[in-house]
Every structure is written in structure tokens, then in C-alpha cells.
Design a protein with these regions (language model features):
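Bacterial N-terminal signal peptides
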Residues: 1-6
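N-terminal carbohydrate-binding accessory modules
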Residues: 10-69
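Extracellular glycoside hydrolase catalytic/binding regions
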Residues: 19, 51, 133-151, 155-274
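Residues embedded in well-ordered beta-strands within globular domains across many folds
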Residues: 39-41, 71, 153, 194
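Feature marks short, surface-exposed loop/turn motifs that line or immediately flank catalytic pockets
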Residues: 44-46, 73-80, 113-115, 158, ...
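Aromatic-lined substrate-binding rim segments of carbohydrate-active enzymes
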Residues: 54-116, 131-133, 173-188, 264-274
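Short glycine-enriched, charge-decorated loop/helix-capping segments at active-site entrances
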Residues: 84-85, 121-126, 167-169
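Active-site-adjacent "subsite" loops/lids of carbohydrate-active enzymes
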Residues: 117-138
Length: 274
């Protein structure tokens, strides 16, 4: 919480690992040690470019906070508005800044809804299976030699319980994620793929009986405070925490707002008890 090796001929020295990888329920750093990711989810790169905030200073501040990973939340509407070439050029620069400050990058296809039925909770998240595969082909090809882009978050928040979000079973969603992973692996066999469950990437209970059948994967949860009533801990364990007994789990979104704060909305409203 990825695997690449260069085999040198005629040598008995250990092979150098340059990528983060999954071993059991842990993320393993290139030096072989366990890696715990602590980081920040950035705003969409296109949004930050437009606001003049996609700068080295922004990344330096994240590193000063103690982050060892940052998340690029790429909204389908934004990449299409700015253009794919310009967006990826901006992300190229961001990756260099992350590397400069000793941080990894999570590449996140930031949609919310039902990819199978192409039903989404807001027009900014509208995409298609074809476009989603295109995005991950582009990422995997462009960054196949860039270990800094260590984690590929395949789909931000799948849900079929929002208004007009269609239907999708776990088996169907599992199959789609496995197809995306296979596409990634065609171009980059090394990146760790992050897989989410339903209920806006909160619920991982189906993993107990039907895990993703691919190697070098980890799971995502977004345990915002209003997903469950207090006390949270036992419910978190039942809903997603148990997965960490066998596989790495990373919370790529987590946090809260006070009820009267700017940005407060369901499901993030809580107090500092959270």
C-alpha cells in the first residue's frame, strides 16, 4: 500500500526492485520494507491549473505536512474540457514535483456512479467504459517506466444506490475491474491497481467471498463519518476493515466538515470526535 525487476546477467547480486508492490496484506517499498501511505487527495489537476495552484509550492506544502503520497483526482468532464494532451502534460509536471519532494502518486479516475450502465450522480462524472479503458491505457503506456505513479485507482466511487444509478451486481463490477486491470497490465505489469466497492467506495463486504482475481491489487474504502452511526470502529471492521487481514486497504478519501463549515454535505458532516 507494484513489482518490477531488472535482471542483470552474470551476477549474483540481488535484483533491485524499483516499484512499490503488494505482498500479502502489505505494501512493500522498493527497499523491501513495509510501506504505509499517508497523504493528501489533491483537487483535480485541471481545477488547480485553472486556479494557478498547480505549482511546485503546492506539492512542497503537502510534503511539509508529512505526506508520502498525493492523489490526482482526474474528473472525466475536466480532462475533456482542458484536453487530454494538456491535462497529461500538466500531470507530467506534477509527477516531477511529487518525485522532487519524495512522494508517490495515486492516479484516480474520478467518477461517481455506475460505469456498467453509464449512470452518474453529476454530469462532471459522466464517462463510458470505452473512455475509462482509454484513460487507463494512456496512463499505463505513458507512465510504464515511472515508479512514482505507483497506484492506479480504477474508479473513484462506484454506487448503485443513488437516484437513477441503474443496477450492477458485485460479480459484474468485479469483472469490469478485472478487465481494466488486464488492460493496465498489457502496458504496465508493475503498477498496483486499487479496487473499490459499492456505496461510494465504502462497502467491501463482497470481497469476503469474491475477491478480485488478479495479482498486485489492493482495496479502497472512503469511510466518511455519516456512513455509519457512532461508535464507528466495529462497523468499519465489518464493512471494510476485515479485508486488511488478507489484502492491503487504503482510505484514499477520509475526513469531515463541521455542520456550518464551507463544503459541508452528506456524508462528511461530523465533529472532531471523528
Amino acid at each position: 500500500m507494484c513489482l518490477a525487476a531488472i535482471v542483470a546477467a552474470c551476477t549474483s547480486k540481488p535484483v533491485e526492485q524499483t516499484w512499490v508492490k503488494v505482498e500479502g496484506n502489505k505494501f512493500i517499498a522498493p527497499d523491501g520494507s513495509e510501506l504505509v501511505f499517508r497523504g493528501l487527495c489533491f483537487s483535480d489537476p485541471v481545477k488547480l491549473v485553472g486556479e494557478g495552484q498547480w505549482t511546485e509550492r503546492y506539492f512542497a506544502e503537502a510534503a511539509d505536512w508529512g505526506a508520502n503520497v498525493v492523489r490526482f483526482a482526474v474528473h472525466p468532464a475536466n480532462i475533456n474540457a482542458m484536453g487530454w494532451d494538456a491535462t497529461f502534460e500538466a500531470m507530467d509536471q506534477g509527477i516531477e514535483w511529487a518525485k522532487q519532494h519524495g512522494m508517490y502518486v495515486i492516479m484516480d479516475w474520478h467518477s461517481i456512479g455506475n460505469l456498467k450502465d453509464a449512470k452518474y450522480t453529476n454530469p462532471m462524472y459522466n464517462t463510458t467504459l470505452e473512455e475509462t479503458f482509454k484513460f487507463w491505457r494512456t496512463v499505463a503506456q505513458r507512465y510504464k517506466d515511472e515508479p512514482t505513479v505507483a497506484l492506479y485507482e480504477l474508479f473513484n466511487e462506484p454506487t448503485v444506490t443513488g437516484p437513477d444509478t441503474g443496477t450492477c451486481t458485485w460479480d459484474e463490477w468485479k469483472g469490469i475491474q478485472e478487465q481494466i486491470i488486464d488492460t493496465v497490465r498489457t502496458y504496465n505489469p508493475n503498477a498496483v491497481c486499487l479496487c473499490a466497492g459499492f456505496n461510494w467506495a465504502y462497502d467491501l463486504t463482497p470481497v469476503a467471498v469474491a475477491p478480485i482475481e488478479r495479482e498486485n491489487v489492493a482495496y479502497v474504502s472512503h469511510p466518511y463519518p455519516m456512513k455509519r452511526e457512532q461508535p464507528w470502529e466495529e462497523q468499519w471492521e465489518a464493512d471494510f476493515g476485515f479485508v486488511a487481514d488478507k489484502y492491503p486497504v487504503i482510505c484514499t478519501e477520509i475526513g469531515f466538515c463541521l455542520e456550518n463549515e464551507l463544503g459541508a454535505h452528506i456524508p462528511v458532516i461530523s465533529t472532531d470526535v471523528y
